[in-house]
């Protein structure tokens, strides 16, 4: 079940390695800088998470056919991995303010709540309950770190936007697990909604990366898409 969610955590690690230096060296306008980067980063992660949940069944069938049943664990593990990536990003606020003990306390709060929820959720829902508990436990860490980041550096995660994304992703996960008629269509529509909702953030990252990866062709593509958006 960890095979697909690991894609998100790997992306998070790559981003964090590149981001950490900028987080420490950027001093002027730090709150605005952190807020802008988080918005772009979270947009990409939300879109990736939606796609993983939507495609996890066919992908698990093709690539991990002997463990196909494990697809049941993918939806909420994907949500948990998304929270884990956010927690790693917000840890930068502790690094730049030299308050590493806050990182420890937030993780401890998440671990304790995770253990308590595991006890009850596994009783109620079996093994899937453990994935739900992981999501909520890491979600608690995310909320605590978001509050700390706001207090320490004035950063905003735009909680309304984040809540909408997580609500839609949770709805997609529940639809997939419930397996109603045409569940593939409904989860696909929710994935499309997530992508449209986060398009501005994803495109902001693409505008930076495409010219570096594709050179002149990338710049032409960026210009064409920008003109299309303006129309």
Predicted regions: what they are:
Residues 1, 5, 9-38, 91-96:
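Helix-loop junctions and terminal segments of transmembrane helices
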Residues 1-13, 17, 44-48, 80-84, ...:
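Transmembrane helix-bundle signature of multi-pass secondary active exporters and lipid flippases
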Residues 7-10, 49-57, 115, 119, ...:
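Membrane-embedded alpha-helical segments of multi-pass transporters/permeases
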Residues 19, 27-43, 47-55, 71-74:
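Interfacial transmembrane-helix starts/ends
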Residues 35, 52-82, 88, 128:
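Interfacial segments at transmembrane-helix termini and the short loops linking adjacent helices
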Residues 71, 101, 108-143, 155, ...:
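Membrane-interface helix-loop junctions in multi-pass transport and translocation proteins
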Residues 78-109, 149-155:
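Membrane-interface junctions at transmembrane-helix termini in multi-pass inner-membrane proteins
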Residues 177-231:
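Membrane-proximal transmembrane or re-entrant/amphipathic helices at the cytosolic face
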